[in-house]
Amino acid sequence: MAALVRTGQLTATELCAAAIARAEAVNPQINAVVYALYEQAQQRAGAGLPAGPFGGVPFLLKDFGAQYTGAPHTSGSRALRNFVPTEDAELVRRWQVAGLNILGKTNTPEFALMGVTEPV
């Protein structure tokens, strides 16, 4: 996907819109995206993303360990339902520098302890 953006065959905005459309189409059935950041992702794509190796590639963060400023970070637990980080995790910062465009956060089993996701 990054190669398509890099070579101009697709814009980051077009790629972002396609990823959002797909997520919106399937999420009602699979409940994967628990916190959407679609509007912000579209703004970032339009404003220009870092030209790292993944420049323009849409990306979803697992809601465990990947703290993202302003987005709830519950680790799948009711106990953390009101926790909203004020800074990004180092890994998230590195992903952004690499050019990934964060679309939202995905479900996780409570504290990632189970092999299945039956979130609250």
Residue ranges and their predicted role:
Residues 1-120:
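Gly/Ser-rich catalytic/binding loops embedded in alpha/beta enzyme cores
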